[in-house]
Amino acid sequence: MTHFKFISLKKAIQIVISHGKRTKKSTKIDLANSLNCISSKEIRSPINLPELDSAGLDGYIISNKKFTKFPVSSKIIKTGKVFKNLNIKYAYRINTGASIPSNFKNFISLENAFIENDYLVLSKSKISNRDIKKKGEDLKKKQILIKKNQKINFIKLALLASVGKKIIDIYSPLKVGVVSTGDELIDYKKKKKDYQTYDSNKLQIINFLKKYPISLDDLGILKDNYKDVKKFYRSKNSKYDLIISSGGSSFSSGDHTSSYLNKNTKILFEY
């Protein structure tokens, strides 16, 4: 009887990793589908954030300090809008995050503003320009957001979305196929006979792997005879980076998967 030496899971993982080859193929992908992918190129911000000076707090803006008081306009400067041709003799209420027009460079927060009879009284108010969020304060145009070979996590994904990146370059995902082997197996969707067994392993493996950024194919159920096994691996081997086989891997004389792999591949470790 042949005895096989077991190895630890840690050792098995180390062996597999040591024989792996980093893919150099690059592809473009929609940002929404890039979670956990690896960037194949450096990504820089195409814009400044914010793109214009903006209000860090709710408050008022005025154009200059020449006047002692400013009538408060009924117009409110809101986020998501562009306001032009504002009267420099007026004070304008502005909401947090709203863009500040280029000729209104003085900001007064609500707490520091003194309003009397619909006038902003400058002598009793306190200008606080430190509360203006400057153009590019969060991100500078051409600033590096993602380095080459960096993993796209959910934080990086949101960062890229904030600068309008729609498509990014990543390394092509590994192509993985999953197959079950066994004469007794039948797809769980089909009606089985008493001597048959529903194939559950493949479904479990496929759904486990869905959390990884890979291209995943269900390769069906393979009958455990040498001719079919040989035909399967010869036709599929060059099409996939990895084929995971469930079942049909014992060391009995009737196991044709192990027989074919032992004859035609390099076995890295026994289990």
Model-derived regions: residue spans:
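Glycine-rich phosphate/diphosphate-binding loop of Rossmann-like nucleotide-binding domains
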Residues: 163-231, 236
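N-terminal small/polar loop signature for handling phosphorylated ligands or for N-terminal nucleophile
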Residues: 76-88, 92-93, 105-107, 206-262
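Short, glycine/charged-enriched secondary-structure capping and boundary segments
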Residues: 107-110, 161, 191-194, 257-261
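Short glycine-rich anion-binding loops that position phosphate/pyrophosphate groups of nucleotides
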Residues: 67, 97-99, 183-184, 247-254
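Short beta-strand segments
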Residues: 93-95, 147, 178-181, 245-246
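Short glycine/serine/threonine-rich phosphate/pyrophosphate-binding segments
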Residues: 102-104, 154-155, 187-188, 251-255
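Phosphate-interaction motifs
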Residues: 2-165
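Glycine-rich phosphate/nucleotide-binding loop
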Residues: 259-271
